[in-house]
Regions:
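N-terminal targeting leaders of exported, membrane, and organelle-targeted proteins
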Residues: 2-96, 102, 157-190
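Short secondary-structure boundary/hinge segments and terminal tails
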Residues: 81-82, 100, 107, 127
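A well-ordered secondary-structure block
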Residues: 105-189
Length: 190
């Protein structure tokens, strides 16, 4: 019975992720106590969230390279914008491109005085769990980043953003206290 409940829970998370992955092209702040390996990496001084964000950038650029497109460059301003949105989705308990203050990604960029000519956003979430349906064990930076990027890749709207005419990418990752990772990608042409 417990096994069935766990399978149902995994299917729910996967279905919810897939359904939310179909959002348009515009797409929070807590601590994580029970996610393994959250301490800083002594070699790089990066948090787990930053390592995951780097892997998401790399995987996105691999997709772009396979299509003969230029790579996106990491941008600190866009990272900040993306991280704030991921944190806010957790803090204010919503999952949407329009935030708790009814602001779109472009409005949030304007609020932070970030210049842009084009902007788009992908959001998603994945549990940090031993057996996520469709993803397997997501309890590493490599596997959880692969899971969310593949989810976006299999969603026409998100994929269009990933291969779109953008120059820069910001990635924000935040975890809930019950180990659900929220992801935001912000694409920009400055």
């Amino acid at each position: 019975q417990m096994h069935c409940l766990r399978i149902i829970q995994q299917m729910f998370f996967l279905l919810l992720f897939i359904l939310q992955s179909g959002c348009g092209n515009e797409s929070i702040t807590t601590t994580v106590d029970n996610v393994e390996n959250m301490e800083l990496n002594s070699e790089t001084d990066l948090t787990l969230q930053q390592i995951i964000a780097q892997k998401i950038l790399e995987k996105t650029n691999t997709i772009r390279n396979s299509r003969g497109l230029s790579e996106l460059t990491q941008n600190d301003d866009m990272d900040q914008l993306a991280e704030l949105h991921s944190l806010n989705m957790i803090e204010y308990n919503f999952f949407d491109h329009v935030d708790h203050q009814n602001k779109s990604p472009s409005q949030r960029a304007d609020d932070l005085n970030f210049e842009w000519r084009r902007i788009a956003e992908n959001i998603g979430y994945v549990p940090w769990f031993e057996n996520v349906v469709g993803c397997g064990d997501t309890r590493s930076a490599e596997s959880i980043s692969e899971c969310v990027v593949e989810g976006w890749r299999n969603s026409p709207g998100h994929y269009a953003n990933m291969i779109g005419e953008f120059d820069q990418l910001g990635v924000g990752v935040a975890f809930t206290n019950d180990s659900i990772a929220y992801f935001t990608q912000v694409f920009r042409v400055p």
